A protein has these predicted regions:
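Acidic active-site catalytic centers that drive phospho-/nucleotidyl reactions
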Residues: 6, 44, 102, 120-123
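Short, flexible helix/strand-to-coil boundary loops that buttress conserved ligand/catalytic motifs
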Residues: 14, 49, 93, 128, ...
Length: 143
């Protein structure tokens, strides 16, 4: 089984010793080759870098280094938004209003046969994606 990782999960993992123990255990149990990112996650991290820059240059620099590490670690496993993902997102977002990035992540997961790993499982409920929230106990579920 392979997984598409949301920003909230990789950000939690980044906390190291302060990471939620359920998230930490789950992440450590998955082979690197089974973990994928969306280009949207890289964009969200970049946004964090830029938002921090004017008020906390040290934090911005640390986030910039982390972004580079993530891009390097996930080279070849970063998925973009193509016509198939856009089509799936259009179908999902017609069901009900959903946050755009969460919907595009769910569409990317469905299109690529991946399980979406996110803390925002309720945001994509009822859209047909297989979702795992490692903050919660229980099995993966199609929502």
């Amino acid at each position: 089984m392979s997984f598409l990782i949301d920003t909230n999960i990789i950000s939690e993992v980044r906390k190291g010793d302060r990471c939620n123990p359920h998230v930490s255990r789950w992440y450590a149990s998955i082979a690197d080759d089974d973990l994928f990112f969306s280009t949207l996650v890289l964009g969200e991290i970049r946004k964090g870098v830029e938002l921090a820059r004017p008020r906390d240059p040290d934090k911005s620099a640390a986030l910039e280094r982390w972004l580079f590490e993530v891009e390097t670690a996930f080279a070849g496993r970063v998925l973009g938004i193509d016509n198939a993902v856009s089509d799936q997102w259009g179908r999902m977002s017609a069901v009900r209003p959903i946050p755009v990035i969460d919907g595009l992540l769910a569409a990317t997961a469905v299109t690529n046969g991946l399980t979406l790993v996110t803390a925002n499982d309720r945001d994509v409920a009822g859209l047909g994606a297989v979702v795992h929230n490692p903050f919660r106990s229980g099995e993966d579920r199609q929502v």
